[in-house]
């Protein structure tokens, strides 16, 4: 499990390999990841946008930026947490992901919350990127 803390907002990521959706013979490797965002601060925040930086084993980079996560822009009051799962396909057996969430407070202040870097490793594969 991977963790990052920004302004008392904790992001935890737990990646896992999806063998049933992967096909190594066709250079298709798929991972899922569960994210928990916990607002341990004393101010409500809204997740407005997400940014992902995804690097495969060959150094190929894909950047993803867009509104919310899994079609939602959750609002987290102090003490609230939000959990979602998503996935990432790659053409190589390993990779690395990191990024940030763009959060907004009730008074309109926008700030970035770090998503920790985490590795995507196929089972039985020596770790290449980390």
UniProtKB/Swiss-Prot annotation:
ApaG domain mapped to chain residues: 3-127
Domain of life: Bacteria
Pfam families: DUF525
InterPro entries assigned: ApaG-like (IPR050718), ApaG_domain (IPR007474), ApaG_sf (IPR036767), Uncharacterised_ApaG (IPR023065)
HAMAP family: ApaG
Name of the molecule in the record: Protein ApaG
Organism: Agrobacterium fabrum (strain C58 / ATCC 33970)
Gene (UniProt): apaG
